[in-house]
Amino acid sequence: MLKPLGDRVILQQQEEEEQTIGGIVIANNAKEKPQSGKVVAVNDGRVLDNGTKVDPSVKVGDQVLFDKYAGTEVKYQGAKYLVLHEKDIVAIED
């Protein structure tokens, strides 16, 4: 598995529905980029300029919401992931 560096987190994005409740099929180019995902890897924490270590706010398995244009999509061993900075995560789902 990939291990994120710095203050980065690796997510597996939620897939968008292929059709609406009314049964209308949505074209791939009309779909919005998903803004939620499951945390699959986190860093060990980041170090501030004064040397203080800050532990990550999220843990593996958390369902999170993130900024719309955050992160970089990567493919690794046939799967798609999103690598983003922890600051781009806006909420953890209960």
Swiss-Prot record:
Protein's UniProt keywords contain Endoplasmic reticulum: no
InterPro entries assigned: Chaperonin_GroES, Chaperonin_GroES_sf, Chaprnonin_Cpn10_CS, GroES-like_sf
**Quaternary state and interactors:** Heptamer of 7 subunits arranged in a ring. Interacts with the chaperonin GroEL.
Which segments of the protein form a coiled coil according to its record? none
What Pfam families does the annotation carry? Cpn10
What is the role of the protein in this entry?
Answer: Together with the chaperonin GroEL, plays an essential role in assisting protein folding. The GroEL-GroES system forms a nano-cage that allows encapsulation of the non-native substrate proteins and provides a physical environment optimized to promote and accelerate protein folding. GroES binds to the apical surface of the GroEL ring, thereby capping the opening of the GroEL channel.
Subcellular location per the Swiss-Prot or TrEMBL entry: Cytoplasm
Per its record, what are the GO molecular function terms? ATP binding; metal ion binding; protein folding chaperone; protein-folding chaperone binding; unfolded protein binding
Q: Which protein is depicted?
A: Co-chaperonin GroES
Task: Please give the biological process terms from Gene Ontology that the record holds.
Answer: chaperone cofactor-dependent protein refolding
Which family does the entry's similarity section mention? Belongs to the GroES chaperonin family.
Give Gene Ontology CC terms.
cytoplasm
Q: Please verify whether the record's keywords include 4Fe-4S.
A: no
